[in-house]
Amino acid sequence: MTVQTERPPSGPSDVRKADGGGTGGTRARAASRAGALAPYLLLLPAAAATVLLLGWPLVKDGLLSFQNLNMAQLIQHVTEWTGFDNYKEVLTGEDFWRVTVRSIIFTAVNVVLTMVVGGLIGLLLARLGRVMRFVLMIGLVLAWAMPVVAATTVYQWLFAQRFGVVNWVLDKLGWHSMADFSWTGSQFSTFFVVTVLIVWMSVPFVAINLYAATTTIPDELYEAAALDGAGMWRSFTSVTLPFLRPFLYATTFLEVIWIFKAFVQVYTFNGGGPDRLTEILPVYAYIEGVGNQHYGMGAAIAVLTILILLGLTAYYLRIVLKQEEDEL
């Protein structure tokens, strides 16, 4: 009988063989490290561009908010650091809080209208035939793709006091008092037109997203609900709504951000008038900073606007997460 015993390594070459090939193992580890770093290297250009285009303006705005920077200091290239004086002046004034409440109400009304109208159109798209769905989606995409300034200009023409189409139609329908009505003459009428404009531009995004969400719902679930005797409303609440809920959360979150900072529509339509009664926070920051040449004050208002928006979104996300935990 022959007994074979394992011979211990006798030299460096045997040690390298026992370690798994020496150079081959080192190359494998190096390749593994390179593979782990590859995603970060690919993300580096995008991250650098984000920091350059978004991070630096935020830092610059934050620095300006601690300075007394008016036209005199700007011409003389003088930097006057004032600490939190700009924030104290803004927070102790009535205008900021009045504009803040107005901005929150304005955002809430527009978001609710946008989500309701967009949700109904999205559900309608799911039930239309192919041709009608295609035509409606073309119209939605065209409305969504129109530049904001161009859309605002069109609405200025539509609601013009003397030659506007809206006043002409209302006059022909019997409302003769509207023939020469000024839509920019009061706070309510101005906000009404701006709200119609914002909802008109925001609905396509909501409708198309919700329609896309309905295409992910299996038909078997509706068939099972019908076999259980569920009607249209029960099928919607038991089958459709649970699938749409994540899309509704995400879409609402985005709409809150976009509408809260709707500067172009409000400022282009009437410049925050009449008598600055339709100013929301972005318009208020621009008028104080650029219009009145109080650049430090405008920067402080902009920083506070960002903080308020972060607070609103954090509160909304907290509600969403709590609802998801309750469902689990």
UniProtKB/Swiss-Prot annotation:
It is a multi-pass membrane protein. Coiled coil: none annotated. It is found in: Cell membrane. It comes from the Bacteria. Induction: Induced by (GlcNAc)2 and (GlcNAc)3. InterPro entries: MetI-like, MetI-like_sf, UgpAE/MalFG_permease. Residues 100-316 form the ABC transmembrane type-1 domain. One of its GO terms (biological process) is transmembrane transport. Keywords: Cell membrane, Membrane, Sugar transport, Transmembrane, Transmembrane helix, Transport. The chain crosses the membrane at residues 36-56, 104-124, 134-154, 188-208, 247-267, 297-317. It holds the Pfam family BPD_transp_1. Belongs to the binding-protein-dependent transport system permease family. The complex is composed of two ATP-binding proteins (MsiK), two transmembrane proteins (DasB and DasC) and a solute-binding protein (DasA). Part of the ABC transporter complex DasABC-MsiK involved in N,N'-diacetylchitobiose ((GlcNAc)2) uptake. Responsible for the translocation of the substrate across the membrane. This is Diacetylchitobiose uptake system permease protein DasB.
